[in-house]
A protein has these predicted regions:
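N-terminal subdomain of nucleotide-sugar transferases
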Residues: 1-45, 62, 66-68
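Acidic anion/phosphate-binding donor-loop and adjacent secondary structure
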Residues: 144, 154-172
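Alpha-helix capping/helix-boundary segments
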Residues: 137-139
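Short N-terminal targeting/anchoring amphipathic segment
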Residues: 11, 49-54, 60-83, 98, ...
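Membrane-proximal helix-turn-helix segments that form the acceptor-binding/catalytic region
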Residues: 87-98, 114-130
Length: 175
């Protein structure tokens, strides 16, 4: 029996609190997430900067096809044309790599209208090997609007366990 290696995931992004909390704090020997490559048009030397994501280009996929097994898109595609996303999906398909989409936003609050985001989602939803979303309500919208069956994985906590478990003061306010 041959030795197995971890599944190598190119996440968009990798260095984001949501993505970091998808794995146990001690790590998961069955999955390795690639570090975020330097962003396109980088204006910072900050290693935590991941946007705009280079992974979402056909060129990056072609140059790094041997470095990963699966792509996982969370967000970061809001500045891309739908045609660029099609080219990216074509490059993944040519390389034999599927991608998973986590549909976080059904409406992008940074866009003045819904048109561009819906066109982007249309491309990604039609090409993804699997779609994940965070709530049953979002899954229903994805099914009604795009005919997509999505798995629901509720949002993981994004604060440290110590903070999450600390006692809270009683109060009458609403947060």
């Amino acid at each position: 029996m041959g030795e197995t290696r971890p599944i190598r995931v190119a996440s968009v992004p990798t260095n984001h609190v949501y993505v970091r909390h998808l794995s146990p704090p001690e790590g998961d020997p069955t999955i390795t997430r690639l570090p975020d490559p330097p962003p396109l048009r980088a204006t910072s030397t900050d290693q935590s900067q991941w946007w705009p994501p280079a992974i979402l280009t056909a060129e990056w996929v072609r140059e790094h096809a041997d470095d990963f097994d699966l792509a996982h898109v969370h967000f970061g595609f809001d500045a891309l044309d739908p045609e660029d996303l099609e080219a990216w999906a074509d490059a993944l398909e040519a390389a034999g790599h599927p991608f998973v989409l986590t549909a976080h936003d059904l409406r992008n609050p940074h866009h003045p209208t819904a048109d561009l985001h819906e066109a982007q989602l249309g491309v990604l939803l039609s090409r993804a090997a699997h779609v994940i979303t965070l709530s049953e309500a979002a899954a229903e919208v994805l099914n009604e609007r795009w005919g997509v069956e999505a798995s629901v994985l509720p949002h993981p906590h994004v604060v440290d366990e110590d903070w999450l478990e600390r006692p809270r003061l009683e109060h009458d306010g609403f947060v």
